């Protein structure tokens, strides 16, 4: 989205299975970490404890993680998995969107949050002046007969953290005509193709994006 109607960004995304963040948590006297990527888990768990003003600690075991910085939204999935497991262990009732706001996720795309809530092919509405987390505009079941091939370049990783924010901040404003064309392609191209299981049309419209 180009911002002319008061909203920026806007995303499309598809959830995938078998590349999960699997986390276990229980109350503890202090923060205890086991398993994978403790250097990534620690600040997330500390942020949860600080945000909820809970004086207890957490025992967190990270069993599995999706690949990082390759476009799978692993940072959001890890943050929400730890936050959900930790909040549940501490008896704190928080929705995924409340946890996302506490964890500072969804600054641009809402796909990772929506994917944590449920599966499917997802379109979010970007950010407006008062947006906390981008709203889901559409969620469709992806045709089960369709297959997706994921290719990872192990020679390099994408940006994250401050470099990623700087890269987004440096992007020029998208021309209104291009933003309109992309929105139209999603609304009357991609979404109907998914709804009608029209793989040829879906592929053609996706190639336009």
What are these regions (language model features)?
Residues 1-74, 84-96, 107:
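ATP-binding N-lobe of GHMP and related small-molecule kinases
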Residues 4-11, 95-209:
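ATP-dependent small-molecule kinase catalytic core of the GHMP/sugar-kinase superfamily
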Residues 29, 82, 205-209:
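Short, basic/glycine-rich phosphate-binding loops at helix/coil junctions
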Residues 82-86, 90, 123, 130-131:
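Amphipathic, positively biased hydrophobic alpha-helical segments used for protein targeting
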């Amino acid at each position: 989205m180009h911002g002319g109607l008061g909203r920026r960004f806007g995303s499309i995304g598809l959830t995938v299975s078998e590349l999960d963040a699997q986390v276990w948590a229980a109350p503890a006297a202090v923060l205890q970490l086991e398993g994978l990527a403790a250097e990534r888990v620690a600040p997330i768990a500390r942020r949860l404890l600080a945000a909820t003003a809970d004086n207890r600690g957490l025992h967190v075991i990270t069993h599995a993680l999706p690949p990082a910085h390759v476009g799978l939204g692993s940072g959001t999935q890890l943050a929400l998995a730890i936050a959900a497991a930790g909040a549940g262990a501490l008896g704190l009732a928080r929705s995924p969107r409340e946890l996302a706001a506490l964890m500072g996720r969804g600054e641009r795309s809402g796909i990772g949050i929506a994917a944590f809530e449920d599966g499917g092919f997802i379109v979010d509405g970007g950010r407006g002046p008062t947006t906390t987390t981008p709203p889901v505009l559409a969620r469709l079941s992806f045709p089960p007969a369709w297959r997706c091939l994921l290719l990872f370049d192990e020679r390099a990783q994408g940006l994250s953290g401050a470099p990623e924010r700087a890269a987004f901040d440096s992007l020029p404003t998208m021309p209104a005509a291009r933003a309109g064309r992309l929105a139209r392609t999603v609304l009357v191209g991609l979404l109907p193709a998914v709804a009608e299981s029209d793989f040829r049309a879906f592929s053609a419209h996706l190639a336009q994006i």
